[in-house]
Regions:
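Redox- and metal-dependent alpha/beta enzyme cores, enriched for Fe-S-associated oxidoreductases
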Residues: 17-18, 211-273, 277-280
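Gly/Ser/Thr-rich loops at beta-strand to alpha-helix junctions
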Residues: 1, 7, 63-70, 209-216
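A charged, amphipathic alpha-helical module
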Residues: 109, 116-243
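Single conserved hydrophobic/aromatic residue that forms the stacking wall/gate
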Residues: 2-13, 285
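Glycine-rich, highly charged phosphate/nucleotide-binding loops
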Residues: 35-50, 271-280
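Acidic/His-rich segments in extracytoplasmic proteins that coordinate ligands and/or metal ions
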Residues: 43-119
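A short, hydrophobic C-terminal helix/tail in secreted or cell-surface proteins
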Residues: 288-290
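Anionic-ligand anchoring segments at beta-strand to alpha-helix junctions in alpha/beta enzyme folds, i.e.
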Residues: 14-35
Length: 290
């Protein structure tokens, strides 16, 4: 996964925006720097960056996904970044393992520490100490508890919240500073609990939205406009998995515990382990029976 970062430390950072370039009309400039044989997604990102669409960024942090994506970020760093207003803006890559082993966890921690946290601290003076990480995890956990409680309301026969409304709230928890949104999430939870639902449910059927990187709200709106109520989700940037509480003890290294949590709980099918490849399927069946 590649994400764009704006300055600060929320649950490791303040604002996160996924690499997107909607409504791209031309790849002319990007095709000059890349090949016209490379995928349109990568060229769209380069095109948008050169146009100035990412000028609000302080950093780009990504992973080694594919050669085309690596080339895309290299072009952003060399061609677009020098013209961005923030001259401290940096691009960094993390080599994230796709197998849950002791040695892969050590490698994961080393990558996040050296390629991400240390660079943030050196460039912007961001506090990445154990104390700061623990505080970030505490705020993260508060958000996760609230969003999970709201999400569970979708299981009711006559839910007080739509799948679209929940998708909006859940995306907010991924993008916005936790300390800023917590008061509003608490207010929203209280308001939803007090809602009076219609005597008859509005939907014609109940469905689960299953997939990979789904962060387009219009897709959720389209499904529910057709009369289907989205009562569960299982996709990247969704709530299950994704909004689980991170349990920390007082003895082990904080960053190691955080990395271990994500390495073990993620259900990315790109993992090399067979059990990880099968996890999304079994988890989907579990959610359906709920």
């Amino acid at each position: 996964r590649d994400c764009l970062l704006s300055r600060g430390l929320g649950d490791v950072y303040k604002r996160q925006v996924r690499l997107r370039a909607p409504k791209t009309g031309s790849f002319d400039i990007a095709s000059y720097y890349m090949s016209n044989y490379t995928c349109e997604y990568c060229r769209a990102l380069v095109e948008r960056a050169i146009e100035g669409g990412y000028n609000f960024l302080d950093a780009i942090a990504g992973v080694d996904a594919c050669a085309e994506m690596n080339r895309c970020m290299e072009n952003i760093e060399l061609v677009a970044a020098p013209d961005m207003p923030n001259k401290k803006m940096f691009v960094t890559h993390c080599d994230i393992p796709y197998k849950v082993k002791d040695y892969t966890l050590k490698h994961y921690v080393k990558q996040i520490r050296n390629r991400f946290l240390n660079v943030l601290a050196e460039t912007y003076g961001v506090d990445t100490s154990d104390k700061a990480l623990r505080k970030a995890v505490k705020e993260h956990n508060e958000v996760c508890k609230i969003i999970t409680e709201i999400g569970d309301m979708r299981k009711l026969e006559n839910p007080p919240i739509t799948g679209y409304e929940f998708h909006v709230l859940n995306l907010v928890t991924y993008c916005c500073p936790k300390s800023k949104i917590l008061p509003y999430l608490k207010e929203t939870l209280a308001e939803i609990k007090k809602r009076k639902v219609d005597a008859k449910p509005w939907y014609r059927c109940r469905v689960a939205l299953i997939g990979s990187e789904i962060d387009d709200l219009d897709m959720t709106r389209m499904v529910e406009d057709a009369g289907a109520m989205i009562v569960a989700d299982r996709f990247c940037f969704g709530s299950t998995p994704g909004r689980e509480v991170i349990e920390l003890n007082d003895t082990d290294d904080v960053l190691t515990q955080i990395c271990a949590h994500y390495l073990k709980t993620t259900q990315c099918p790109r993992y090399m382990s067979q059990e990880k490849i099968q996890e999304p399927v079994s988890y989907t069946h579990l959610r359906a029976h709920e």
